[in-house]
């Protein structure tokens, strides 16, 4: 069980009524708290929670409409995302209790100061390198629309400026990361057909593909509901059409793809997790059509080339700069 869940269960008597658990991990916490509902923005966690606790978990960027008497937020990595989530929860809890739980190395002590906007926070427990905080909502805020927190910026690309809309919690929020910047220089000569932007984030790569290859069908895929929402906003801001889907890794992707393009993720919260990226490399052949291509950027220290060669039988390094490599491989 997640150590943060264990800290909650040390105070289980506080959580016996209708409770919303925001950012709920995919463990047995719902099984221990029978009146609780979960809210998650991670498609993999949602799939596991729904399979074990059918009808008790909500996936999306907005809190479920169902009533709750109190709520607990599992602290996310992004401080801006935490602020949005705390505001969304506090706006529904006037005079009632809001809890915040997180790991010390995830910044729980600093994040707890964000509770001061709603009342007088107090620390209830500290165990398993985690802390649990509580505040009674004396000053319930107005709920802020998610789009009001969007960061909008423009990228100067070869074929004209691209408008990017990013949301709190999305990878490289509000700026272009170095890996994607390098990959954007290597989008020439791609095979047309059905293209996939895997781990799409704010949709920079997918939007660029659709603009550069307008006759191709472009699908954007991410595990995170906020990334899915941001990608849709980015496409709309540029007058582009594309299919944006949520799913847990490459298994959720279409097959018979002409292209997989990716700056694959390797962080889950504050933890490093290479599973999604390694699955992408190992299973790429299942999703590419014959002659289809995979092109991706990754940190130079990651040993991805043997995995790509094992799946597709070939792999070349197109470029290396600034600590990143561009890999290219074709399904024979």
Swiss-Prot record:
GO terms for molecular function: 16S rRNA (guanine(1207)-N(2))-methyltransferase activity; nucleic acid binding. Keywords: Cytoplasm, Methyltransferase, rRNA processing, S-adenosyl-L-methionine, Transferase. It is an enzyme of class 2 (transferase). It is found in: Cytoplasm. The keyword S-adenosyl-L-methionine applies. Its EC number is 2.1.1.172. Pfam families: MTS, MTS_N. Its main location: cytoplasm. The keyword Transcription does not apply. Gene3D superfamilies: Vaccinia Virus protein VP39. GO terms for cellular component: cytoplasm. It catalyses: guanosine(1207) in 16S rRNA + S-adenosyl-L-methionine = N(2)-methylguanosine(1207) in 16S rRNA + S-adenosyl-L-homocysteine + H(+). Monomer. Belongs to the methyltransferase superfamily. RsmC family. Specifically methylates the guanine in position 1207 of 16S rRNA in the 30S particle. PANTHER family: RIBOSOMAL RNA SMALL SUBUNIT METHYLTRANSFERASE C (PTHR47816:SF4). This is Ribosomal RNA small subunit methyltransferase C. It comes from Pseudomonas putida (strain ATCC 47054 / DSM 6125 / CFBP 8728 / NCIMB 11950 / KT2440).
């Amino acid at each position: 069980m997640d150590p943060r869940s264990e800290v909650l269960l040390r105070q289980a008597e506080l959580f016996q009524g209708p409770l919303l658990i925001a950012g709920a991990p995919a463990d047995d916490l719902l099984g221990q708290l029978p009146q609780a509902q979960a809210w998650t923005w991670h498609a993999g966690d949602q799939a596991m929670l729904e399979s074990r606790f059918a009808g008790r978990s909500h996936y999306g960027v907005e809190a479920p409409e169902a009533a709750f008497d109190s709520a607990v937020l599992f602290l996310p990595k992004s401080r801006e995302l935490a602020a949005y989530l705390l505001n969304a929860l506090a706006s529904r809890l006037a005079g009632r209790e809001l809890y915040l739980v997180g790991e010390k190395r995830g910044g729980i002590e600093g994040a707890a100061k964000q509770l001061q906007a709603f009342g007088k926070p107090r620390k209830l427990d500290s165990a398993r390198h985690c802390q649990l905080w509580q505040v009674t909502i004396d000053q319930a805020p107005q709920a802020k629309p998610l789009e009001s927190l969007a960061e909008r910026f423009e990228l100067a690309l070869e074929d004209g400026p691209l408008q990017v809309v990013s949301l709190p919690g999305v990878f490289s929020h509000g700026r272009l990361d170095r890996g994607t910047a390098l990959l954007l220089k290597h989008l020439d000569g791609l095979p047309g057909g059905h293209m996939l932007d895997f781990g799409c984030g704010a949709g920079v790569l997918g939007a660029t593909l659709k603009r550069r290859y307008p006759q191709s069908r472009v699908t954007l895929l991410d595990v995170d509901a906020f990334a899915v929402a941001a990608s849709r906003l980015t496409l709309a801001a540029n007058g582009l059409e594309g299919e944006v889907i949520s799913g847990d890794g490459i298994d959720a992707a279409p097959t018979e793809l002409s292209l997989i393009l990716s700056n694959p993720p390797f962080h889950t919260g504050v933890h490093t997790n290479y599973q999604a990226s390694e699955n992408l490399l190992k299973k790429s052949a299942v999703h590419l059509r014959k002659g289809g291509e995979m092109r991706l950027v990754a940190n130079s220290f990651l040993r991805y080339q043997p995995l790509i060669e094992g799946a597709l039988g070939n792999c070349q390094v197109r470029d290396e700069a600034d600590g990143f490599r561009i890999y290219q491989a074709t399904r024979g």
